[in-house]
């Protein structure tokens, strides 16, 4: 992730681990539970400073992995946006009747993360590294979609 920008396997590993340890009870505070899990694991990474809920363009990204260039010649940084819907709502039709709730949530996440990346602070925070914008969408505790936008 830090040197070659290959983020998929690392984030997939975290998503799989979350699926394995989650239970129905975790769904009560689903988004906070998911964010807490990712915060714990991402913070173990020495290549980045993990900044949760960083304010960017009047919104709060779930995670900004800021490069620790003091200790490592990191070449990539990441904004990660986590989205979650209960299993009962994921494929349900939205009020417009044209899209599922998951499709609408994804479209909103794309707009959101692009807006975060355009924030004036981002240029200074990324310190010349390549910025990756990653969205991870969960159905309950299972990862359904993960893409760089």
Positions of predicted regions on the chain:
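Structural signature of nuclease core domains in nucleic-acid processing machines
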Residues: 3-149
């Amino acid at each position: 992730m830090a040197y070659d920008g290959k983020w998929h396997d690392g984030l997939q590993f975290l998503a799989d681990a979350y699926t394995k340890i989650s239970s129905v009870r975790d769904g009560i505070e689903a988004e906070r539970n998911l964010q807490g899990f990712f915060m714990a694991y991402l913070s173990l990474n020495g290549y980045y400073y993990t900044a949760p809920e960083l304010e960017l363009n009047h919104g709060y990204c779930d995670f900004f992995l800021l490069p620790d260039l003091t200790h490592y010649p990191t070449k990539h940084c990441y904004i990660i946006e986590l989205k979650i819907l209960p299993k009962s709502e994921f494929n349900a039709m939205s009020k417009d009747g044209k899209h599922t709730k998951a499709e609408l949530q994804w479209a909103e996440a794309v707009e959101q993360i692009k807006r975060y990346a355009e924030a004036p602070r981002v240029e200074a925070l990324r310190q010349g590294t390549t910025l990756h914008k990653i969205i991870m969408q969960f159905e309950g505790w299972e990862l359904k979609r993960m893409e760089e936008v």
